[in-house]
Amino acid sequence: MKQTVYTASPESQQIHVWSLNHDGSLKLVQVVDVPGQVQPMVVSPDKRYLYVGVRPEFRVLAYRIAPDDGALTFAAESALPGSPTHISTDHQGRFVFVGSYNAGNVSVTRLDDGLPAGVVDVVEGLEGCHSANISPDNRTLWVPALKQDRICLFTLSDDGKLVAQEPAEVTTVEGAGPRHMAFHPNQQYAYCVNELNSSVDVWELKDPHGNIECVQTLDMMPADFSDTRWAADIHITPDGRHLYACDRTASLITVFSVSEDGSVLTKEGFQPTETQPRGFNVDHSGKYLIAAGQKSHHIAVYAIAGEQGLLTEKGRYAVGQGPMWVVVNAY
C-alpha cells in the first residue's frame, strides 16, 4: 500500500504533497500553488480526485490525483454559496457537501464523473455550521451547528436534496459547540468533538427503539487546565481501537481508547504537539498520525503504538504558512 499526505496552508495558498513511507517518514513530492486560500480538503471515494475549498472567491476545486505518486493536476471548479469551512463526500462519490461557518449553511454539489458540476441544494439557518458528515450507510448527513449547540440530521435523496429527518436534530449541552465528527467502523456509534468546552460526545446511531442517544460525554483536557478551551478536530483509527482529538489553546492531542463495541471511550493520555493544531489525520494503516500546527507552520508525524494508542513523534516538517488541513490517500 502506498500513501500520500496532503496538507493545506491557506496563508501561503499552497498544498504540499508528501509520500508517507512505511517507517513514518515523509518525502516531499510536490508543492501546488492554489488560486485562493485553501482550507478544507477531501479525497474522492475512488481516490481519483482531491476536492478543496478556497476563499475569498468561494469555490470547490477538483485536482486529479496521479496514481503513481499522488501528484495533483487541476481538473475543474464550481462556485459555492458560502465560505467553505469543511468539505466531504458521500460514499458513492456522487455529491460533495460543504459546510460554511460564516454563511450558516450546508450545500450539496453534484459530481459528474468525479468533477464538480454545480450546487443542487442549500440548507440555510445553521448558525456556525462547522462540518457535514455522511453516515456509514450513506443515508443521513450529520451537520453540527456550533453556535446553536445542535447537530442537524438530513436524509440524502437520490438527487442530492437534503430532507430534514424526524427528529430533525440532536442537541448537546449548552455552550458545548459541536464541531467535527468521526464514525466507528462498526457503524453503530459516532463521536463529536465540541469546540467551546473541549469535550467529546459519543452518539449511539440507533438504539433498539430507533432513537439517537448521547451515551457518554468526556472532558478531553487535563484536570489542571484552566485556560480558554478551543478544540478542533477528531479522528478514529481504521480498526476502531483508538480515537484522537486536539485542542488549539493547549496545543495537545488527547488519546482515547475505544471499547470493542464502540460505546465507551477511556482517556489514556495527552501528546504535546505543534502550536495551535487546527487539523490532523490518521493514515490508512492505523500506524501513524499527522498533525498540522497553524502557528508553527510545521506538520509532525507520530507513531501509534500499544494497547493505549499513545503517540511517539517520528519527525516534523516545514510546510506552507498557517497549515490547517491534513488528508491521507491510500492506493
From Swiss-Prot:
One of its GO terms (cellular component) is cytosol. Pathway: Carbohydrate degradation; pentose phosphate pathway; D-ribulose 5-phosphate from D-glucose 6-phosphate (oxidative stage): step 2/3. Its EC number is 3.1.1.31. Signal peptide: none annotated. GO terms for biological process: glucose metabolic process; pentose-phosphate shunt, oxidative branch. It comes from the Bacteria. GO terms for molecular function: 6-phosphogluconolactonase activity. Pfam families: Lactonase. Keywords: Carbohydrate metabolism, Glucose metabolism, Hydrolase. It is an enzyme of class 3 (hydrolase). It catalyses: 6-phospho-D-glucono-1,5-lactone + H2O = 6-phospho-D-gluconate + H(+). InterPro entries: 6-phosphogluconolactonase_YbhE, Cycloisomerase_2, Lactonase_7-beta_prop, N2O_reductase_N, WD40/YVTN_repeat-like_dom_sf. Coiled coil: none annotated. Belongs to the cycloisomerase 2 family. Catalyzes the hydrolysis of 6-phosphogluconolactone to 6-phosphogluconate. This is 6-phosphogluconolactonase. It comes from Citrobacter koseri (strain ATCC BAA-895 / CDC 4225-83 / SGSC4696).
